Amino acid sequence: MSLLDAHIPQLIASHTAFAAKAGLMRHTIGQAEQQAMSAQAFHQGESAAAFQGAHARFVAAAAKVNTLLDIAQANLGEAAGTYVAADAAAASSYTGF
């Protein structure tokens, strides 16, 4: 029996909630990308060049955000596993009350 078991469900719930929110953010970024591609046809001349530059920066930023979301999600998942493993390994050193 571990003295630290109370936080394991919270870690798992946080990982699940973060995965859902990250999925929603990815979907929103994807929708913004589609809307931008649709709007691109309305730009001409200098406006088109400016739009393409801004769109390229958006795509680069979106890629960075998606990478950070992947890293954060992996870290949350790993935290729960590491916590459980470390807690189980230390369980033998716990003394009774």
UniProtKB/Swiss-Prot annotation:
GO terms for cellular component: extracellular region; protein-containing complex. The keyword Secreted applies. It is found in: Secreted. The keyword Zinc does not apply. Keywords: Secreted. Pfam families: WXG100. It comes from the Bacteria. Forms a tight complex with EsxR. Exists in heterodimeric and heterotetrameric forms. In the heterotetrameric form, EsxS adopts a long helical conformation that pairs with a second EsxS monomer in an antiparallel manner that allows the N- and C-termini of two EsxS subunits to interact with an EsxR subunit at each end of the EsxS dimer thus creating a molecule with four-helix bundles at its extremities. Belongs to the WXG100 family. CFP-10 subfamily. This is ESAT-6-like protein EsxS. It comes from Mycobacterium tuberculosis (strain ATCC 25618 / H37Rv). The gene is esxS.
